[in-house]
Amino acid sequence: MHKAPISTLILDSLFSNMMLAEMMNDDQLELLKHQQTGIQPVVPEGCNLYWSSLNVTGPETKPTNFVDRFRNNMPKRRVKEILHNVSGMAESGKLLAILGSSGAGKTTLMNVLTSRNLTNLDVQGSILIDGRRANKWKIREMSAFVQQHDMFVGTMTAREHLQFMARLRMGDQYYSDHERQLRVEQVLTQMGLKKCADTVIGIPNQLKGLSCGEKKRLSFASEILTCPKILFCDEPTSGLDAFMAGHVVQALRSLADNGMTVIITIHQPSSHVYSLFNNVCLMACGRVIYLGPGDQAVPLFEKCGYPCPAYYNPADHLIRTLAVIDSDRATSMKTISKIRQGFLSTDLGQSVLAIGNANKLRAASFVTGSDTSEKTKTFFNQDYNASFWTQFLALFWRSWLTVIRDPNLLSVRLLQILITAFITGIVFFQTPVTPATIISINGIMFNHIRNMNFMLQFPNVPVITAELPIVLRENANGVYRTSAYFLAKNIAELPQYIILPILYNTIVYWMSGLYPNFWNYCFASLVTILITNVAISISYAVATIFANTDVAMTILPIFVVPIMAFGGFFITFDAIPSYFKWLSSLSYFKYGYEALAINEWDSIKVIPECFNSSMTAFALDSCPKNGHQVLESIDFSASHKIFDISILFGMFIGIRIIAYVALLIRSYNNT
């Protein structure tokens, strides 16, 4: 990456038409001031992108249920052809639109060109940039991809999001903080986001924020910060009205006119939007039916016997003509074949074929010294614009903002902890140490573990699964390392998982009348912190392994409830059947409960009422005289205090490592 003056990154014309349409806001005045400076838009020259003989196959059906995935006698799934011998090109300084009906293959073609979402697909063929074969790392280095669905961390403002992206995508090696900040402000102005720059992006049904149109513009702003040579857009007008859609495509056309290579897929463009395309690629049944200037497609269809009716949207006519009707599939296939043959018989069609064949030969014979390094680049050694430390700091900042701003992450949890702690403290208020209250005191300690587990563990799962798609997308875009994200998020969230357990323990410990010693209180706080963090580690692991909120929330209690049952409160260790004792060894409830019980009962040397002369001989024999006898009655040993703490700490670290490995595997599969 070579440093260029920040002025060369200015795209003054981008979204200027959109701004002029918003006459009632102050952003137009900012844009006019910006234009009056006389700075001309300078965009890095784009690339000529070629794809040759692309063939893509994939499974026709997925396993119908969980059992079918593991049945030995499951019939082999049939394979279907998704793309067949697809060749084409996207020229520098041109806007290419890929059109077709549902199932035509346009989304698959976009995925192949961007090297994304290709799991379970067999892809054959080659992609070249300016005549040189390009792997997925080269494509991602030179391009940006605006995906159909906007994904953001909703607790950040528009400006903060762009500052975050600029810090990671522009890097700290080539640009100073001042240059990055200047670029962010320029893009905010160009995108018409000045008036909402300090508005939070928003979380659906939780936190009100930007509108759909503003989020779409923010998506564009995120991707063009570094002015990529190639811009891919998947359904850029999705969710926008016709007026705004026209201005979005006009903005893309402006980018192309200034030298960028722009490729989009689009669904049912209006006639105005269609007129903005330099070239169109019409697809049907996984084949390219036409590739060339948009204004030459309608005459070709007319020549083949399918004229466009008067006053009819040409894009609708082209797509409807190439649509496959299941009730009359033979006629549809005949129409598609006739138009394709008509296109191939033209000079334009022959030139497309010739370019495809030439690039196929070039790709087959392409060997250079520089290509060797590209072939060895993998997910684990790819290059990033920002250093690990810069990535960590930026991700920590974003995660911290999420913690303090998300209503479900702090305020609700704090209120929940306070209410539960005070209710527990009132129920067990100043419980005395007597033979009759031994079970109550043990219940206080087990409640410590159970309450902190269920109050924080289960609500944390949907928070992680909601953020996971954002992380996977940003990671696939090469914005940051998986390790930097995981470390930053864990450290940013750790303070609340220290403060909340201490707060709960402080209220319950002193209100319920547990052993009144400061060091015993500190040890109980330590155990509560460890139990909480083991529980959170499990939520991390389950969420990253299963990724789906419903599945994760179903699996979690299946694991946690049996572990809790063998925690030592409901059944003693000696009473557990031998074939279930291993569950007790895995129970973090058991280690936490034992540590708290030792902390309480080991300090109690005498239980006075057990020396009452009025008690019967049988009652005296069964009455524990001190805390050690209480521990023996529940199969706990006072010598296990440090051992229990060590096991809990080991579980905390070990399960976090499992969660990280699961996230790493998921990130790898998503690249």
From Swiss-Prot:
It comes from the Eukaryota. It holds the Pfam family ABC2_membrane_7. SUPFAM superfamilies: P-loop containing nucleoside triphosphate hydrolases. Keywords: ATP-binding, Membrane, Nucleotide-binding, Transmembrane, Transmembrane helix, Transport. ATP binds at residues 100-107. The keyword Iron does not apply. Coiled coil: none annotated. SMART domains: AAA. It is a multi-pass membrane protein. The chain crosses the membrane at residues 409-429, 452-472, 498-518, 526-546, 551-571, 645-665. One of its GO terms (molecular function) is ATP hydrolysis activity. Signal peptide: none annotated. GO terms for biological process: regulatory ncRNA-mediated post-transcriptional gene silencing; transmembrane transport. GO terms for cellular component: plasma membrane. Required for efficient RNA interference (RNAi). Plays a role in germline development. Belongs to the ABC transporter superfamily. ABCG family. Eye pigment precursor importer (TC 3.A.1.204) subfamily. This is ABC transporter ATP-binding protein/permease wht-1.
